Amino acid sequence: MEAESSTPQERIPKLRHGRTSGPARRSTRGQWTAEEDEILRKAVHSFKGKNWKKIAEYFKDRTDVQCLHRWQKVLNPELVKGPWTKEEDEMIVQLIEKYGPKKWSTIARFLPGRIGKQCRERWHNHLNPAINKEAWTQEEELLLIRAHQIYGNRWAELTKFLPGRSDNGIKNHWHSSVKKKLDSYMSSGLLDQYQAMPLAPYERSSTLQSTFMQSNIDGNGCLNGQAENEIDSRQNSSMVGCSLSARDFQNGTINIGHDFHPCGNSQENEQTAYHSEQFYYPELEDISVSISEVSYDMEDCSQFPDHNVSTSPSQDYQFDFQELSDISLEMRHNMSEIPMPYTKESKESTLGAPNSTLNIDVATYTNSANVLTPETECCRVLFPDQESEGHSVSRSLTQEPNEFNQVDRRDPILYSSASDRQISEATKSPTQSSSSRFTATAASGKGTLRPAPLIISPDKYSKKSSGLICHPFEVEPKCTTNGNGSFICIGDPSSSTCVDEGTNNSSEEDQSYHVNDPKKLVPVNDFASLAEDRPHSLPKHEPNMTNEQHHEDMGASSSLGFPSFDLPVFNCDLLQSKNDPLHDYSPLGIRKLLMSTMTCMSPLRLWESPTGKKTLVGAQSILRKRTRDLLTPLSEKRSDKKLEIDIAASLAKDFSRLDVMFDETENRQSNFGNSTGVIHGDRENHFHILNGDGEEWSGKPSSLFSHRMPEETMHIRKSLEKVDQICMEANVREKDDSEQDVENVEFFSGILSEHNTGKPVLSTPGQSVTKAEKAQVSTPRNQLQRTLMATSNKEHHSPSSVCLVINSPSRARNKEGHLVDNGTSNENFSIFCGTPFRRGLESPSAWKSPFYINSLLPSPRFDTDLTIEDMGYIFSPGERSYESIGVMTQINEHTSAFAAFADAMEVSISPTNDDARQKKELDKENNDPLLAERRVLDFNDCESPIKATEEVSSYLLKGCR
């Protein structure tokens, strides 16, 4: 063969994926080809199906296990895949009785054509007597849905919650039936009853034990010797939890209690046989109650895990301590010291009472005569953890013997003798020995009184009572059931005295549960109601104690209590943690922020948190959306800088309101708000205000503002006084220049308005604009000074005159001299004049973006040597921000206005004499080279005829529209 040339030494060893032993995993593919199957047949025939490691050497990527499974399950010609015969099933049952249900390879040798896997599946899915082959009940389906929500498709795990159902049967029933009924169960609300119930897993061995007992009962109702010995050996090894239900005993009856004997009179056994549809009423003298001891720090009954009831031939039910997996070994050892087995002659019920706290986990009965156990109540045993809530034990359990004669003769009295009772004042101390217990003996009393039957209802079965609810009856029990078995008729329950007699101040809520009518039908479903939402902790046996006792450091979880439900959650008081500082800054620092000022010496802020400092500023949270309460330290700095911004911005804001100021003056005939006027200031600091009609008003600035200005605009006075001081300094400088016989270069700046006529109205026409002025126009640093000041040529005006332009956008004059309304608003030609200085430096915006600056520097409107200081005065307008497109649009509009206005003035007023040209050359030489380089457009060598002044200016000013 070709495959024989391939040896293991020639192969490359594969990784073992974490395994340290076993064959190397050389393949993960599961598809076998036809060639591989043929090679496997020949190899098996060559080695006679014995040496599978040698057989695996014929394949490069196959292990010996894969080859074995492929041969046994698929390729073996002797393999039988058909249905099982009756003879094969009988052989499997006999072999399992001989070898046990684990040696499947040995069992398969006696069944030709069958492998161990087939035998195992046949037993667990069909032949096992513990399998429940009946139709699925509604409770089982609801329990399956509940368990499937937790474990999913782990069918082997689901078998622990559904005794008698195999994993294969559960899987088939889920996909065939339950999965389709899921929506109907959800809508009907039946599934909600199982949501609050925790799942209690079952031991398969317990079901097998009950089934094994059933199968080994002989005709006389007795166990054979082999079955009895096997049961004894099992119970000696471990106490197995068992849940008894009607379905476990469908094909026969099992004797329970003291009437069940390994051998005895069959007639007596038949009279006391337990059937699935009969009820069981125990007598008080035959009741054996085993109560687990609970330590002082385990008062919370919710800490106990699930537990079951176990059966044994010792004539009682026992509490399974082995299932308390979460309890320490010492605790379990103390529990094991409780005497569990009781015989029929035992008339006592032992109650473990450590630390004055009783925790009744399971009440078990040894008498099988009269236990009231309908089939619908079988599920109560399936969820014993719901019954493990706290119960208050009646004072009647510890009543003195001399109190017996004072009680109604019909009431069953449980009292403890003075010699046996160990509950005293010392039991109030938590240091009492955990092994302390007292014995409650049944009352013997008068001869005519015998203990009445007792129905012990756990706290789970009552919604309003937290005590151990006892319903005593007459000597002859008068409990009857109706036809369908859904109600229990209680005879004369008015004599019952129960529920927390240990305190004189029992609440009405606890007493409202008792039935005062002579007869009343009590639904059985009331006993199956859900547990209360809140767990009950057991009260201590202390006098006058009515409220639940809560201890610190018990580990019991308690919900956060608020002062009032009417108040919002943010009004609560949260005390400061003492140990861990990070608890003060629990989620988003709420604990610190919500701390009341009454309990906190100083207000605490969110950014004091160790983690909040790093994440609060940059993270998005609901706290950042609050207005003023939770501001970061950055906002405090902004509030300080806002004062500087307001001072720097006062000039630009004040002059934009001058027209409003003059409109409110008493002399409304001057009509300052409807025309363009000029204020001339002379050396004596008098202001001459010229309106459009040529009228003039003069006076001191102080008299102007004090006489004309309303009170709400008096804050502009200081701003105008600053302007007055600036004008005086400019006059002094011009005077010095005139004494040196150097012609001063006039500085002009005007406000450009666009009117309906389409032509600009210049406040001071006839002025010449030099190249230095054009350069200064394009410099953002000097815009405020040029806006507030304008010096006129000393040939036309006084050398010391300074004019301030006041512009009103409402009305303007056309060519004919008539006043015309202007619908468009006045528009400043510079964005630097109309916005406050240094506003928004600390806030991120598109103006400070490096992309904006990089795109602005090589712009044709700005030279490449523009410094950062010049860029510092480019800000966003107040109360708004621009995007990148809006920024460039705003700059282009205003710089176009600069260029158009400067070019129009130069072309319209172009001197032709030699003196003017010499003056231009002198200006060019004396100008700062830095300013000269900042011009927008240079028309130095361009001249136009004077007659075309209007046409040229109109052409150049098209960009302003």
From Swiss-Prot:
Instruction: Name what induces it.
Output: Slightly induced by salicylic acid (SA). Expressed in a cell cycle-dependent manner, with highest levels 2 hours before the peak of mitotic index in cells synchronized by aphidicolin. Activated by CYCB1. Accumulates at powdery mildew (e.g. G.orontii) infected cells.
**Role description:** Transcription factor that binds 5'-AACGG-3' motifs in gene promoters. Involved in the regulation of cytokinesis, probably via the activation of several G2/M phase-specific genes transcription (e.g. KNOLLE). Required for the maintenance of diploidy.
Name the InterPro entries on file: Homeodomain-like_sf, Myb_dom, MYB_TF, SANT/Myb
What ranges does the record list as Polar residues composition bias?
Answer: 391-405, 416-430, 764-781
Compartment annotation: Nucleus
Example GO molecular function term? sequence-specific DNA binding
Please name the GO terms of the biological process aspect recorded for this protein, alphabetically.
defense response to fungus; negative regulation of cellular response to caffeine; positive regulation of DNA-templated transcription; regulation of cytokinesis; regulation of DNA endoreduplication; regulation of DNA-templated transcription; response to fungus; response to salicylic acid
Q: What does the subunit section of this Swiss-Prot or TrEMBL entry state?
A: Component of a DREAM-like complex which modulates a variety of developmentally regulated genes and of the mitotic genes in proliferating and differentiated cells. Associates with CDKA-1, RBR1 and E2FB, but not with E2FC, in proliferating cells, at early stages of leaves development.
What's this protein's name? Answer: Transcription factor MYB3R-4
Renumbered ranges of motif Nuclear localization signal: 612-619
Q: Where is the composition biased (Basic and acidic residues)?
A: 534-554
Tell me the organism.
Arabidopsis thaliana
Which stretches does the entry tag as region Disordered?
1-33, 390-457, 534-555, 756-781
Report the domain of life of the source organism: Eukaryota
One GO cellular component term: phragmoplast
